[in-house]
Amino acid sequence: MISFLSGCLYPEDRLAQNRVPYKDQIAMVQSAVDQFQEAEGGILPLKTKENETPIFQKYLIDFKKLSPRFIAEPPGSAFESGGIFQYVLVDVETDPTVKLIDLTMVDAIRDLKLRIKFFAERNGYPPYKEPLDQEKGYFSLDYDKLGYNNTSPFVVSPYSGKNLSLFIDTKGEILVDYSPDLYDALKKFKHNYKTGDDIRYLLVENYDFVPAFSVPYTVKDNDPIFLKE
């Protein structure tokens, strides 16, 4: 799930300058994407990804196709320029729109995956703790067995700045629990989402970021729950 990144993610001395501002840079990339699509007969400047790639990580913008004709170079906030954002597209069929993946969460996910790998090599299975959804195969993890010493790894939400917990599925993928952000969004924004709808799009519609490394959620009694597909 994080295979599109490798090595050192971003030099520390470039973090501050390449984190903000990003609003103008999103607009610049959106303009370049629109021009490319018009010039290329509807084709989008995308990197090739496997069909099973999670939807919000599937449509990565290929800046090599945009530069230098439509944009001088990738914006400073882009991963390709040493920044901490991966530029992606959503609504590719109807209204291709530029959004961001916050890559600061990748280090925590990668570290957890490595610890699980070493544990599983010794024990034959990950250190599952409790089922979060037995039917979907989502589990919490016993972090003490992974050497976290009474602490739990987390990622910082690009939406709220809250600490978001992590969990695992039966395929070994590490996933981010966006339920706190979804709960807030359901209360904050007017919407027509009902049980059975994927409410992650409420975040996409109202923020510049996509909920990367996530699973589908829906709403029941005004609360976010895992979507039963």
State what each model feature region is:
Residues 3-7:
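C-terminal motif of bacterial Sec signal peptides marking the signal peptidase cleavage site
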Residues 9-12:
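Bacterial signal peptide processing site
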Residues 16-23, 27:
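Juxtamembrane membrane-water interface segments immediately C-terminal to a transmembrane helix
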Residues 25-41:
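N-terminal alpha-helical signal peptides/signal-anchor transmembrane segments
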Residues 45-109, 116, 120, 127-229:
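Extracellular/periplasmic head regions of type IV pilus-like filament subunits
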